[in-house]
Amino acid sequence: MKKKIAEYEVGEQVDLFLLIKTATKGIASNGKPFLTVILQDQSGDIEAKLWDVSPEVERQYTAETIVKVAGDIQNYKGRIQLRVKQIRVANPNEVTDISDFVEKAPVKKEDMVEKITQYIFEMRNPNIQRLTRHLLNKHQNDFLDYPAATKNHHEFVSGLAYHVVSMLDLAKAISTLYPSLDKDLLYAGVILHDLGKVIELSGPISTTYTLEGNLLGHISIMVNEIGKAAEELKIEGEEVLILQHIVLSHHGKAEWGSPKPPLVKEAEILHYIDNLDAKMNMMDRALGRTKPGEYTERVFALDNRSFYKPKFQTYYDK
């Protein structure tokens, strides 16, 4: 069985069909145009450069194009890259299904729906429960398909739902340790905090930002969605405002994208849970591609650090 792109090591030769996830134009120091392409299959993705490209080449190698690539894996300033020697657009008879090249969450959609539904069922506050169920039902199909981001963490098919399920399990464990937390608020905040991304982002494959995503962002989108849902369901009360605040503040600081800092206990905890799960996902995936006794490639979103994988640990190999 042929290896996937994430399984190749530095120095190895590559000859694979891959999907162009993104293609970004740049200008080199010599004034000539180049493309930075992110190539992916079900195992993950890798960056590559196409140098001295013509307008025709730019039109050929766009997002969602399947290509045949030959080259070798190299480490450039702590980042793993594919040095391209040959590349061409795949013929229709060579590959047929774009989903064969897309990374997916490791848990089935139906299992994630069942778990999230159970958490909603456990809510005792009827206003919080009705709002949460209404909004999830409204966006459920996209919620189960979309990634949680365009890059850095959970940026794969069903990544958004997988992120939420992990956060719900964290929220439950923390609530057991700190019983003064309002579980209804915390669970609802987890489920709703990133739900606006189904409007902010374009879809599960070659994900980009929509017009609404660029102009409003997922936080503002979901605050408005909560308000509209409350009107439709004729729900009045402080729960609506607090849920809006939890969504509004979940990034923690203005410089991280939240207009207000967390001013409710559950909002503060949600911010930490969100941050923890995102960082664990980034570290686990980087370490999963690393041999014991070696460092990961640099993880840009974690201060561009490389993480060491101790020789005595076998967790990531299981």
Swiss-Prot record:
Record-given protein name = 3'-5' exoribonuclease YhaM
Give a short account of what the protein does: Shows a 3'-5' exoribonuclease activity.
InterPro entries, alphabetized: 3'-5'_exoribonuclease_YhaM, HD/PDEase_dom, HD_domain, NA-bd_OB-fold, NA-bd_OB_tRNA, YhaM_exoribonuc/phosphodiest
| Keyword set includes Nuclease | yes
Q: What Pfam families does the entry give? A: HD (PF01966), tRNA_anti-codon (PF01336)
* Highest classification ranks of the organism: Bacteria, Bacillati, Bacillota, Bacilli, Bacillales
**A Gene Ontology molecular function term of the record:** nucleic acid binding
Keywords from UniProt, A to Z, are:
Exonuclease, Hydrolase, Nuclease
The record's gene field reads yhaM
Any GO BP? rRNA 3'-end processing
This enzyme's EC code(s): 3.1.-.-
